[in-house]
Protein backbone atom coordinates (compact mmCIF):
# COMPACT_ATOMS: atom_id res chain seq x y z
CA UNK A 1 0.00 0.00 0.00
CA UNK A 2 1.18 3.49 -0.82
CA UNK A 3 0.18 7.01 0.11
CA UNK A 4 1.54 9.34 -2.58
CA UNK A 5 0.76 12.48 -0.55
CA UNK A 6 2.62 11.17 2.50
CA UNK A 7 5.56 10.12 0.33
CA UNK A 8 5.74 13.60 -1.21
CA UNK A 9 5.83 15.27 2.20
CA UNK A 10 8.56 12.91 3.39
CA UNK A 11 10.58 13.75 0.29
CA UNK A 12 10.18 17.48 0.94
CA UNK A 13 8.24 18.15 -2.25
CA UNK A 14 5.81 21.08 -1.81
CA UNK A 15 2.20 20.10 -2.47
CA UNK A 16 -0.27 22.71 -3.73
CA UNK A 17 -3.91 22.10 -2.88
CA UNK A 18 -7.47 23.34 -3.15
CA UNK A 19 -10.22 23.29 -0.51
CA UNK A 20 -13.47 21.52 -1.43
CA UNK A 21 -16.55 22.89 0.33
CA UNK A 22 -19.29 22.20 -2.21
CA UNK A 23 -19.75 18.69 -0.79
CA UNK A 24 -20.43 17.29 -4.23
CA UNK A 25 -18.77 14.47 -6.15
CA UNK A 26 -19.39 16.07 -9.55
CA UNK A 27 -17.54 19.26 -8.68
CA UNK A 28 -14.86 17.23 -6.87
CA UNK A 29 -14.16 15.27 -10.05
CA UNK A 30 -14.12 18.46 -12.11
CA UNK A 31 -11.49 19.95 -9.81
CA UNK A 32 -9.52 16.69 -9.60
CA UNK A 33 -8.55 17.28 -13.21
CA UNK A 34 -7.39 20.86 -12.64
CA UNK A 35 -3.83 19.96 -11.70
CA UNK A 36 -3.69 20.42 -7.92
CA UNK A 37 -1.52 18.02 -5.93
CA UNK A 38 -4.17 17.57 -3.25
CA UNK A 39 -7.81 18.33 -2.57
CA UNK A 40 -9.22 18.84 0.91
CA UNK A 41 -12.67 17.33 1.47
CA UNK A 42 -14.00 19.41 4.36
CA UNK A 43 -16.18 17.71 6.94
CA UNK A 44 -15.82 20.45 9.56
CA UNK A 45 -17.44 23.46 7.90
CA UNK A 46 -18.93 22.01 4.70
CA UNK A 47 -22.18 19.96 4.71
CA UNK A 48 -20.45 16.59 4.37
CA UNK A 49 -21.06 13.21 5.97
CA UNK A 50 -19.47 9.79 5.53
CA UNK A 51 -21.55 9.07 2.42
CA UNK A 52 -20.69 12.33 0.66
CA UNK A 53 -17.02 11.94 1.57
CA UNK A 54 -17.13 8.45 0.06
CA UNK A 55 -18.56 9.65 -3.24
CA UNK A 56 -15.94 12.40 -3.48
CA UNK A 57 -13.14 9.93 -2.76
CA UNK A 58 -14.50 7.74 -5.55
CA UNK A 59 -14.70 10.74 -7.91
CA UNK A 60 -11.13 11.85 -7.21
CA UNK A 61 -9.59 8.35 -7.30
CA UNK A 62 -8.86 8.13 -11.07
CA UNK A 63 -6.93 11.42 -11.04
CA UNK A 64 -3.42 12.34 -9.84
CA UNK A 65 -4.76 14.74 -7.17
CA UNK A 66 -4.59 13.19 -3.71
CA UNK A 67 -7.55 13.49 -1.33
CA UNK A 68 -7.17 14.77 2.22
CA UNK A 69 -10.21 14.52 4.49
CA UNK A 70 -10.98 16.79 7.43
CA UNK A 71 -13.41 15.28 9.94
CA UNK A 72 -15.62 17.56 11.99
CA UNK A 73 -13.70 16.73 15.16
CA UNK A 74 -10.93 14.60 16.65
CA UNK A 75 -13.39 11.75 17.16
CA UNK A 76 -12.18 8.12 16.92
CA UNK A 77 -15.54 6.82 15.73
CA UNK A 78 -15.75 9.34 12.89
CA UNK A 79 -12.09 8.78 12.03
CA UNK A 80 -12.68 5.01 11.86
CA UNK A 81 -15.57 5.49 9.44
CA UNK A 82 -13.60 7.85 7.20
CA UNK A 83 -10.67 5.45 7.06
CA UNK A 84 -12.95 2.54 6.23
CA UNK A 85 -14.41 4.34 3.21
CA UNK A 86 -10.89 4.92 1.91
CA UNK A 87 -9.37 8.07 3.38
CA UNK A 88 -5.65 7.67 4.02
CA UNK A 89 -4.75 11.25 4.90
CA UNK A 90 -6.67 13.09 7.60
CA UNK A 91 -6.50 16.71 8.73
CA UNK A 92 -7.65 16.76 12.36
CA UNK A 93 -9.06 20.13 13.49
CA UNK A 94 -8.51 22.01 16.73
CA UNK A 95 -5.72 19.92 18.24
CA UNK A 96 -4.64 21.78 21.37
CA UNK A 97 -1.94 19.63 22.94
CA UNK A 98 0.20 16.51 22.69
CA UNK A 99 -2.42 14.26 24.30
CA UNK A 100 -4.98 15.21 21.67
CA UNK A 101 -2.38 14.65 18.95
CA UNK A 102 -1.62 11.19 20.35
CA UNK A 103 -5.33 10.39 20.39
CA UNK A 104 -5.60 11.35 16.73
CA UNK A 105 -2.74 9.06 15.77
CA UNK A 106 -4.14 6.18 17.83
CA UNK A 107 -7.49 6.46 16.06
CA UNK A 108 -5.78 5.81 12.72
CA UNK A 109 -3.84 2.72 13.79
CA UNK A 110 -4.96 -0.86 14.26
CA UNK A 111 -4.00 -2.48 17.59
CA UNK A 112 -1.61 -2.83 19.20
CA UNK A 113 -0.34 0.50 17.85
CA UNK A 114 -3.75 2.17 18.19
CA UNK A 115 -7.48 1.76 18.66
CA UNK A 116 -8.90 1.60 15.14
CA UNK A 117 -11.67 -0.98 15.01
CA UNK A 118 -11.31 -3.88 12.59
CA UNK A 119 -14.06 -4.03 9.98
CA UNK A 120 -12.11 -4.63 6.80
CA UNK A 121 -14.66 -7.06 5.34
CA UNK A 122 -17.06 -4.11 5.06
CA UNK A 123 -14.48 -1.50 4.09
CA UNK A 124 -13.68 0.08 0.76
CA UNK A 125 -10.23 0.82 2.18
CA UNK A 126 -9.31 -2.87 2.09
CA UNK A 127 -11.28 -3.41 -1.11
CA UNK A 128 -13.48 -5.66 1.00
CA UNK A 129 -10.53 -7.83 2.06
CA UNK A 130 -9.16 -8.11 -1.47
CA UNK A 131 -5.94 -6.30 -0.52
CA UNK A 132 -3.59 -8.99 0.84
CA UNK A 133 -2.44 -8.34 4.41
CA UNK A 134 -4.33 -5.04 4.58
CA UNK A 135 -4.46 -5.12 8.38
CA UNK A 136 -0.67 -5.38 8.51
CA UNK A 137 -0.01 -2.66 5.94
CA UNK A 138 -2.63 -0.03 6.69
CA UNK A 139 -0.93 1.66 9.65
CA UNK A 140 2.12 2.67 7.61
CA UNK A 141 -0.06 4.15 4.85
CA UNK A 142 -1.87 6.53 7.19
CA UNK A 143 -0.91 10.21 7.11
CA UNK A 144 -1.96 12.26 10.14
CA UNK A 145 -2.01 16.04 9.92
CA UNK A 146 -3.11 18.05 12.94
CA UNK A 147 -4.36 21.63 13.01
CA UNK A 148 -3.11 24.23 15.45
CA UNK A 149 -5.55 27.13 15.55
CA UNK A 150 -5.25 28.85 18.93
CA UNK A 151 -2.68 30.49 21.16
CA UNK A 152 -2.87 27.45 23.44
CA UNK A 153 -2.00 25.12 20.57
CA UNK A 154 0.83 27.41 19.49
CA UNK A 155 2.26 27.33 23.01
CA UNK A 156 2.15 23.51 22.92
CA UNK A 157 3.62 23.18 19.44
CA UNK A 158 6.95 21.72 20.56
CA UNK A 159 5.29 18.87 22.47
CA UNK A 160 2.83 18.24 19.61
CA UNK A 161 5.77 17.91 17.23
CA UNK A 162 7.30 15.26 19.51
CA UNK A 163 4.30 12.94 19.07
CA UNK A 164 5.20 9.85 17.07
CA UNK A 165 2.99 9.38 14.03
CA UNK A 166 2.31 13.05 13.33
CA UNK A 167 3.28 13.67 9.72
CA UNK A 168 2.42 17.34 9.49
CA UNK A 169 1.03 20.33 11.34
CA UNK A 170 -1.43 22.67 9.67
CA UNK A 171 -1.79 26.25 10.86
CA UNK A 172 -5.38 27.51 10.72
CA UNK A 173 -5.08 31.25 10.04
CA UNK A 174 -8.79 32.07 10.36
CA UNK A 175 -9.28 30.60 13.82
CA UNK A 176 -5.82 31.62 14.97
CA UNK A 177 -6.39 35.26 14.05
CA UNK A 178 -9.75 35.20 15.85
CA UNK A 179 -8.21 33.64 18.96
CA UNK A 180 -5.48 36.27 18.94
CA UNK A 181 -8.08 39.05 18.85
CA UNK A 182 -7.87 39.87 15.15
CA UNK A 183 -10.94 38.08 13.77
CA UNK A 184 -11.11 38.23 9.99
CA UNK A 185 -7.61 39.65 9.74
CA UNK A 186 -5.02 36.88 9.43
CA UNK A 187 -2.72 39.37 7.74
CA UNK A 188 -2.25 41.31 10.98
CA UNK A 189 1.49 41.53 11.73
CA UNK A 190 1.17 39.65 15.04
CA UNK A 191 -0.71 36.80 13.36
CA UNK A 192 1.77 36.68 10.50
CA UNK A 193 4.69 36.54 12.92
CA UNK A 194 3.08 33.61 14.75
CA UNK A 195 2.41 31.77 11.49
CA UNK A 196 5.92 32.29 10.13
CA UNK A 197 7.58 31.23 13.38
CA UNK A 198 5.42 28.10 13.48
CA UNK A 199 6.28 27.13 9.89
CA UNK A 200 10.00 27.37 10.65
CA UNK A 201 9.61 25.41 13.91
CA UNK A 202 7.56 22.64 12.29
CA UNK A 203 10.00 22.20 9.42
CA UNK A 204 12.98 22.21 11.79
CA UNK A 205 11.36 19.34 13.70
CA UNK A 206 11.23 17.24 10.55
CA UNK A 207 7.47 17.54 10.10
CA UNK A 208 5.53 19.04 7.21
CA UNK A 209 4.07 22.53 7.75
CA UNK A 210 0.76 23.29 6.06
CA UNK A 211 -1.69 26.16 5.67
CA UNK A 212 -4.63 27.48 3.65
CA UNK A 213 -4.01 30.91 2.16
CA UNK A 214 -5.74 32.39 -0.88
CA UNK A 215 -3.53 35.49 -0.87
CA UNK A 216 -0.99 34.56 -3.55
CA UNK A 217 1.87 36.62 -2.15
CA UNK A 218 1.45 35.15 1.33
CA UNK A 219 1.08 31.61 0.01
CA UNK A 220 4.37 31.99 -1.85
CA UNK A 221 5.98 33.49 1.25
CA UNK A 222 4.95 30.43 3.30
CA UNK A 223 6.37 28.11 0.65
CA UNK A 224 9.65 30.03 0.77
CA UNK A 225 9.73 29.56 4.55
CA UNK A 226 9.35 25.81 4.13
CA UNK A 227 5.62 25.06 4.09
CA UNK A 228 5.06 21.75 2.31
CA UNK A 229 1.31 21.50 1.86
CA UNK A 230 -0.39 24.76 0.98
CA UNK A 231 -3.99 25.13 -0.14
CA UNK A 232 -4.27 28.23 -2.29
CA UNK A 233 -8.02 28.54 -2.77
CA UNK A 234 -11.52 27.34 -1.93
CA UNK A 235 -14.00 26.02 -4.49
CA UNK A 236 -16.94 27.96 -3.04
CA UNK A 237 -15.00 31.22 -3.16
CA UNK A 238 -13.81 30.61 -6.72
CA UNK A 239 -17.36 29.95 -7.86
CA UNK A 240 -18.99 32.83 -5.97
CA UNK A 241 -16.45 35.51 -6.86
CA UNK A 242 -16.08 34.27 -10.43
CA UNK A 243 -19.84 34.32 -11.01
CA UNK A 244 -20.16 37.79 -9.49
CA UNK A 245 -17.33 39.14 -11.62
CA UNK A 246 -18.82 37.69 -14.81
CA UNK A 247 -22.23 39.17 -14.04
CA UNK A 248 -20.67 42.56 -13.29
CA UNK A 249 -18.82 42.61 -16.61
CA UNK A 250 -22.16 42.37 -18.37
CA UNK A 251 -23.76 45.16 -16.37
CA UNK A 252 -25.59 43.17 -13.75
CA UNK A 253 -27.32 45.53 -11.32
CA UNK A 254 -26.13 43.66 -8.25
CA UNK A 255 -22.89 45.15 -7.07
CA UNK A 256 -19.93 42.93 -6.34
CA UNK A 257 -20.09 41.71 -2.79
CA UNK A 258 -16.68 43.02 -1.81
CA UNK A 259 -16.44 39.90 0.30
CA UNK A 260 -14.24 40.31 3.34
CA UNK A 261 -13.86 36.66 4.32
CA UNK A 262 -10.48 35.24 5.19
CA UNK A 263 -10.42 33.04 2.08
From Swiss-Prot:
Substrate binds at residues 147, 174-175. The record marks 84 as: Increases basicity of active site His. Keywords: Aromatic hydrocarbons catabolism, Lyase, Metal-binding. SUPFAM superfamilies: Phosphoenolpyruvate/pyruvate domain. One of its GO terms (molecular function) is metal ion binding. GO terms for biological process: 4-hydroxyphenylacetate catabolic process; phenylacetate catabolic process. Pathway: Aromatic compound metabolism; 4-hydroxyphenylacetate degradation; pyruvate and succinate semialdehyde from 4-hydroxyphenylacetate: step 7/7. Catalyzes the reversible retro-aldol cleavage of 4-hydroxy-2-ketoheptane-1,7-dioate (HKHD) to pyruvate and succinic semialdehyde. Pfam families: HpcH_HpaI (PF03328). Binds 1 divalent metal cation per subunit. The active site is at residue 45. GO terms for cellular component: cytoplasm. A divalent metal cation binds at residues 149, 175. This is 4-hydroxy-2-oxo-heptane-1,7-dioate aldolase. The record marks 70 as: Transition state stabilizer. It catalyses: 4-hydroxy-2-oxoheptanedioate = succinate semialdehyde + pyruvate. Its EC number is 4.1.2.52. Its cofactor is a divalent metal cation. It is an enzyme of class 4 (lyase). Belongs to the HpcH/HpaI aldolase family.
